[in-house]
Amino acid sequence: RTSRKREGEVRRVDPNASRRFDRVYWQSVAWIGHRVAVALQYAHDQRVLHRDIKPSNLLVDSQGEVSVADFGLAKSIDQAGISRTGDVVGSLRYMAPEQLAGAADTRSDVYSLGVTLYELVTLHPAYNESERAKSLIHGNAILPVRPSQIRHDIPSDLETIILKSINIEPERRYQSAEELATDLRRFCEDRPILARRTSPVERLW
């Protein structure tokens, strides 16, 4: 679903905020992620990649319905891998490493949604944009700190979902937006998630 209505736009919150969040907040973030993942799966089923998932492209109306906006950079899955290396398409801050190399696929959208969820739960950017630009250009992987190192009260299952979504190796991420949507829904329903928690060493490989 798309919309031009911007008043309900999901915005990044003050990174200096220090209040603790309750279970309702965490579940609200997870529910937003779930609805976006469902929308992405629909787009992927139509053979379309969004390629620019970020907070400003997620809209929430007065009824709590979530819409994915701005398909201006969307591309057919069948053509997404033929961009010339060096053609940066999307927002670097939310871009999967393989997307910069012109090798985007459905898991690249999963990655961008994961980075968006990271920022919504920590109220901090996942990456320093200038440092990340250098790392992507030179092929050096950098990892964001665990969300729980910034927000000590984040539920471990929600952190696990986010970290799996933003793994630098596409093969270690959720393999579809549907898989991500399933775990986010299970979290919202207080059911065990399917993803397992990864160690810091595993995140590097």
Ranges and model annotations:
Residues 1-27, 85-86:
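Intrinsically disordered, low-complexity regulatory tails flanking kinase catalytic domains
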Residues 19-37, 41:
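Conserved short alpha-helix within the protein kinase catalytic core
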Residues 27, 83-86, 145, 195:
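Residues at secondary-structure transition points
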Residues 34, 40-41, 45, 56-62, ...:
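C-terminal lobe helix-coil module of Hanks-type protein kinase domains
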Residues 49:
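Conserved catalytic-core element of eukaryotic-like protein kinases
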Residues 53:
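Hydrophobic HxD+1 residue recognition
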Residues 66, 79-89:
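Regulatory activation segment
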